[in-house]
Amino acid sequence: MPIIDDLLHIIHNTASEIPTFDQRLGPGADKGNGATKFFVKKVNEIAAERWPNQVQQNFRAVPNTRMDFDLYVPSECTAIEIALSLRNSVSEYEKDIFKALLAQSAGLPLKRLILIGKNDSVRIRNMPASVAIRNWAWEKHSLKIEVHEIAAAASVTMADDAPGEED
């Protein structure tokens, strides 16, 4: 099984173990921000234990910047951004894609960017503007953008292959 597939499974399972995962807790270190940090920390601990040399955490995407990917798997040329607020109309969707394009431009072998969001992220990111950005990233930069939605009770993956590509 590819590392990314296994890692996505771990991310989904970790979310299902947190009873308040689907709730909107609000901003703040003791609320939503703290819950997100706890979730990311758990995922990172499992990844570090399972793949100490294959999965890079907080990977510097663009040299001489503070632009990092949450996770990067060099052998699969894939980055993962845990962007739980993707379901909000204003999120880091465009910024994360632009970061990936800058990383490619700087020479990072990157063919796939996976964005992890909470429930309703898939619906929001299937709106015309988001689809246009995804298609442009593929057509102009051969960068496949995927949005995966996780929820405590279930998981849904966006059926969104890049144009002309089938799994």
Model-derived regions: residue spans:
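Domain-level recognition of nuclease-like catalytic cores that cleave nucleotide substrates
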Residues: 115-167
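Short, well-structured alpha-helical interface segments that form or flank functional binding sites
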Residues: 34, 38, 64-66, 91-99
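Short, charged, amphipathic alpha-helix that recurs within catalytic cores of restriction-modification
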Residues: 91-113
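Conserved catalytic cores of phosphodiester-cleaving nucleases, focusing on short active-site segments
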Residues: 71-86, 100
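Active-site-adjacent loop/helix micro-motif of nuclease/hydrolase catalytic cores
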Residues: 81-97, 123-127
